[in-house]
């Protein structure tokens, strides 16, 4: 029984007289003792879990019985585990909690996980296929059947393929959240039609990591680190936020220290031992200063550097007159980075000399347990931002913390690649609308330039699918997207696959309701820590019915309305395109047991799970097959504590037919490197052409960028005097501060009314995620505004107070927002968070009314647009009584509409930071006002295009380096010009 303190004499008398109640009596003897409570239900209870209804307490204890069905959260990219509580009486989802068996999230979720129930019950969600009526974008819609939509879409695709217009069929996705199914579809169609959002997200960082190792993402082992360097806000909102935050906290609890590099005092920075609010765009210089200290104080792992870097190649080509030894290489490094002293970094970056030196020493002293991560942040913000991740990884190479316990590993070591049934072969197509010749090194598709390419007449789209993708609101230059989405001569048919209306779906021809995270099947796997796991996202109501013995063959039978799921939709569409199999498409979507029937999701995932290492044995131990095991538990850990994969010795079978080059020591099979011989043993190495970590990149010379062969510092577009890609390894500190932004340190211009700042527009809020959180009432009650963060010293020059209106003027327009005066931002920098500023017009269907404002949109002529907020979020009538309780009236400002595109000429990453003018709002300005000139945005696109060095200029016969990975990789023949 729970502990109850003994009563004193006076209290006993009071109880006896009835003055106070006798709480010794157990009013609910059926309730368990406190000692028996657990944070989670045991998996043995998941089929029939009893819980008392909180809504009826304390009047009575009403027992509810649930089936707990595991699935995967889809409210960010972390893939955390969820348990859906399916009410056995009503067959509805009551709530979502964490899945304690999930290796990444371990039963813990952020606010976004439980808020999945809000999305399921959203009164504005789309429950049936909708087709446009009237002009595209005017707001007219009618309900149609799935059969009608499939027939229309399939007919257009069939015609496009028959007429060899393969590049006109495109699938454009934001967050896929799944592994492999859409690749199957597009390859079966024979199109190079995959487009993604990665070049507005993470391509900058990916490119820098890839140059080093051939792997484009890091996998930090935070829990075992001694020192963590974060160029992010990972305790609250960064990539793989929840799993990473847990392990950062564990590392700190074990004694690790952490430094955060960020102009903004994030919650993560507030918890760190060191906050380094650098001048935006100078982060690479700071990292090279750390390297300078580590080199000069000999805080290096000499053996690792000698064994695993391509120092011999670098010395032979660039320093042939120097000693061709590792000591000669280290001496050369000291000379190369000699000017990046702590004093230089202090002057350039605006941080203290002592802090630079102290953090550098802590990195060096941590050695193999130095851990770091960057994903967006500075790498996504600036021209040359890819050098930030490259310089960051340089610190790992110097300290030998690559692939070590407590260090940082390549992501692919901890991410499972599924073996899938009957995969189609790669296509021979190359879509230059996605991979243009101007950007041969772009790490992902140049997706944010699609409207500009269409306007230039580079091509057209006949069938354009958008999925988990809202570029009108999420991307820069959203009005240019509206212009091309409305134009049927540029986009013939736009199909929006979405559970909810959004700013891009308003300009579609079909809006087809796809299932939310708990309403569809997906296989997920992410590099959340030093282990490898898979998780099964499944439609929980369908699975609950199946477990109860009901026959369900189509997810629409269990989902709300006629909401479908992608897998079944794509299978049906492929059969509609190729009903008799004559096009060679249908065969990839036929049942393996009966070719006259479509492939089922059960068959697809059964094959995938049958081939997961160790899963069959784990399932057999419980007398289950692998699919049943995954349905029951939702997750499986394949490997734990995976380190040092580059040292793996290759087997005789792996080396069958291999030859060893006597000079490079590369082991190759049919000309393809498979490993490297070191000290007489052939081991795996890394995925670079040399199989070593490439400090020196011959690729950069081969593709026309010889000034960037080694880690360096490129002047950001925020700070540059002229449009250039000048490296900074040869620029002295006395020429650091450009005149373009000399207002950034509090030096007012002659016109006090209008000042130039750096706008930081990309930071996330812990409670929101892109478009998806707009329909979650709990999340929007927590976070509704995205004010302008401005330092107290900057605000004082205008006597600005929190809540005052300010106008932010970009190169193509302006927006009006409210100020938040704070010391949590570096002077000379203003910041505005992502996620907010959702909008709809009166003519549009009700959409995300928990978060969106009603606006008017005017075309003023000559490419000029104006958006005015008419009213913010307000109460509305629905089946959810909370919709009448909305108390907030500000939905934020859609700042991205006012940003021109800034494509980095090398990585292809959109450089998010903006050089803006800030001033108090004029008397006619209103919060939420947006004015944009798309003619000017097109001119800026061309200015940035002129920075590129297109493939023909380099003398290359290839479109792209063959060793660079890319999504939906075509045949090698397609790479050739």
Residue ranges and their predicted role:
Residues 182-248, 254-259, 285, 392-510, ...:
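Extended redox/cofactor-interaction regions of prokaryotic respiratory oxidoreductases
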Residues 539-636, 865-889:
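Long, C-terminal catalytic modules of enzymes
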Residues 802-813:
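Short conserved beta-strand and strand-loop elements enriched in small hydrophobics
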Residues 255, 259, 264-367:
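Long, well-ordered, tryptophan-enriched scaffold segments
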Residues 150-168, 218-227, 336, 357-372, ...:
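Glycine-rich phosphate/diphosphate-binding loops that line cofactor/substrate pockets in enzymes
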Residues 823-836:
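Short, solvent-exposed secondary-structure boundary/capping segments
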């Amino acid at each position: 029984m729970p502990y109850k303190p003994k009563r004193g004499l006076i209290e006993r008398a009071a109880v006896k007289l009835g003055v106070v109640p006798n709480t010794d009596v157990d009013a609910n003897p059926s309730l368990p003792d406190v000692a028996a409570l657990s944070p989670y239900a045991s998996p043995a209870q998941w089929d029939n879990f009893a819980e008392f209804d909180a809504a009826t307490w304390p009047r009575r204890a009403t027992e509810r019985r649930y089936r707990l069905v595991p699935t995967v959260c889809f409210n960010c990219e972390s893939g955390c585990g969820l348990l859906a509580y399916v009410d056995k009486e009503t067959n509805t989802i009551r709530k979502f909690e964490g899945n304690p068996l999930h290796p990444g999230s371990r039963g813990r979720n952020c606010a976004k996980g439980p808020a999945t129930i809000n999305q399921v019950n959203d009164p504005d969600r789309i429950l049936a296929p909708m087709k446009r009526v009237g002009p595209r974008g005017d707001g007219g819609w009618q309900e149609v059947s799935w059969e009608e939509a499939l027939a229309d879409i399939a007919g257009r695709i069939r015609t496009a393929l028959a007429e060899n217009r393969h590049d006109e069929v495109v699938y454009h996705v934001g967050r896929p959240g799944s592994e492999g199914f859409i690749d199957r579809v597009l390859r079966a169609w024979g199109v190079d039609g995959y487009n993604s959002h990665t070049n507005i997200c993470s391509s900058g960082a990916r490119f820098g990591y890839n140059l080093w190792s051939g792997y484009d993402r890091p996998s930090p082992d935070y829990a075992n680190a001694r020192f963590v360097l974060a160029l992010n806000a990972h305790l609250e909102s960064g990539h793989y936020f929840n799993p990473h935050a847990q392990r950062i906290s564990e590392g700190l609890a074990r004694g690790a220290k952490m430094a955060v590099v960020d102009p903004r005092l994030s919650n993560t920075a507030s918890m760190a031992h060191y906050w380094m609010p650098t001048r935006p765009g100078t982060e690479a210089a700071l990292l090279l200063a750390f390297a300078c200290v580590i080199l000069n104080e000999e805080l290096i792992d000499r053996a690792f550097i000698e064994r695993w870097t391509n120092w011999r190649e670098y010395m032979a080509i660039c320093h042939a007159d120097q000693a061709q030894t590792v000591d000669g290489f280290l001496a050369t490094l000291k000379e190369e980075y000699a000017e990046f002293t702590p004093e230089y970094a202090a002057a350039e970056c605006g941080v203290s000399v002592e802090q630079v030196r102290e953090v550098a020493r802590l990195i060096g002293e941590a050695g193999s347990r130095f851990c770091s991560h960057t994903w967006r942040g500075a790498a996504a913000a600036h021209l040359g931002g890819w050098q930030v991740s490259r310089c960051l990884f340089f610190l790992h190479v110097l300290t030998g913390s690559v692939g070590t316990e407590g260090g940082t590993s390549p992501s692919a070591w901890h991410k499972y690649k599924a073996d899938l049934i009957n995969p189609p072969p790669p296509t021979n197509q190359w879509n230059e609308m996605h991979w243009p010749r101007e950007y041969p090194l772009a790490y992902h598709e140049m997706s944010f330039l699609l409207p500009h390419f269409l306007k230039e007449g580079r091509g057209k789209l006949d069938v354009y699918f958008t999925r988990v993708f809202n570029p009108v609101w999420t991307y820069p230059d959203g009005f240019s997207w509206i212009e091309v989405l409305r134009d049927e001569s540029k986009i013939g048919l736009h199909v929006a696959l979405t559970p909810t209306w959004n700013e891009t779906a308003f300009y579609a021809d079909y809006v087809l309701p796809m299932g939310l995270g708990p309403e569809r099947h997906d296989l997920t796997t992410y590099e959340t820590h030093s282990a490898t796991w898979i998780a099964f996202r499944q439609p929980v109501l369908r699975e609950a019915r199946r477990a109860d013995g009901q026959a369900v063959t189509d997810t629409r039978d269990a989902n709300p309305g006629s909401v479908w799921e992608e897998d079944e939709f794509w299978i049906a569409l492929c059969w509609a395109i190729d009903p008799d199999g004559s096009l060679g498409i249908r065969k990839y979507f036929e049942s393996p047991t009966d070719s006259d029937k479509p492939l089922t999701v059960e068959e697809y995932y059964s094959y995938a799970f049958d081939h997961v290492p160790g899963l069959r044995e784990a399932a057999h131990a419980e007398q289950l097959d692998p699919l049943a095991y995954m349905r029951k538990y939702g997750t499986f850990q394949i490997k734990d504590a995976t380190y040092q994969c580059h040292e793996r010795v290759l087997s005789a079978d792996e080396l069958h037919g291999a030859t060893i080059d006597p000079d490079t020591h590369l082991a190759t099979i049919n000309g393809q490197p498979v490993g490297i011989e070191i000290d007489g043993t052939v081991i795996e190495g890394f995925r670079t052409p040399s199989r070593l970590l490439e400090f020196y990149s011959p690729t950069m010379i081969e593709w026309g960028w010889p000034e960037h062969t080694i880690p360096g510092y490129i002047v950001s577009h925020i700070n540059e005097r002229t449009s250039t890609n000048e490296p900074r390894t040869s620029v002295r500190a006395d020429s650091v501060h450009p005149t373009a932004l000399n207002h950034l340190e509090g030096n007012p211009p002659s016109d006090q009314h209008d000042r130039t700042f750096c706008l930081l527009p990309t930071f996330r809020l812990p409670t929101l995620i892109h478009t998806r959180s707009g329909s979650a009432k709990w999340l929007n009650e927590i976070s509704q505004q995205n004010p302008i963060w401005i330092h107290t010293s900057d605000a004082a020059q205008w006597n600005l107070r929190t809540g005052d209106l300010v106008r932010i003027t970009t190169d193509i327009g302006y927006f009006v927002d409210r100020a938040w005066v704070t010391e949590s931002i570096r002077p000379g920098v203003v910041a505005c968070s992502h996620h907010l500023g959702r909008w709809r017009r009166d003519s549009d269907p009700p959409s995300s009314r928990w978060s969106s404002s009603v606006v008017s949109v005017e075309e003023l002529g000559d490419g000029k647009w104006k958006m005015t907020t008419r009213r913010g979020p307000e109460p509305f009538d629905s089946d959810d009584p909370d919709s009448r309780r909305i108390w907030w009236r500000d939905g934020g400002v859609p700042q991205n509409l006012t940003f021109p595109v800034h494509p980095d000429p090398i990585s292809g990453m959109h450089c998010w930071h903006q050089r803006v003018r800030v001033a108090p709002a004029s008397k006619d300005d209103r919060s939420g006002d947006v004015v944009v000139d798309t003619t000017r945005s097109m001119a800026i696109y061309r200015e940035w295009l002129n920075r590129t060095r297109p493939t023909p200029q380099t003398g290359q016969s290839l479109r792209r380096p063959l060793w660079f990975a890319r999504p939906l990789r075509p045949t090698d023949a397609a790479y050739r010009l």
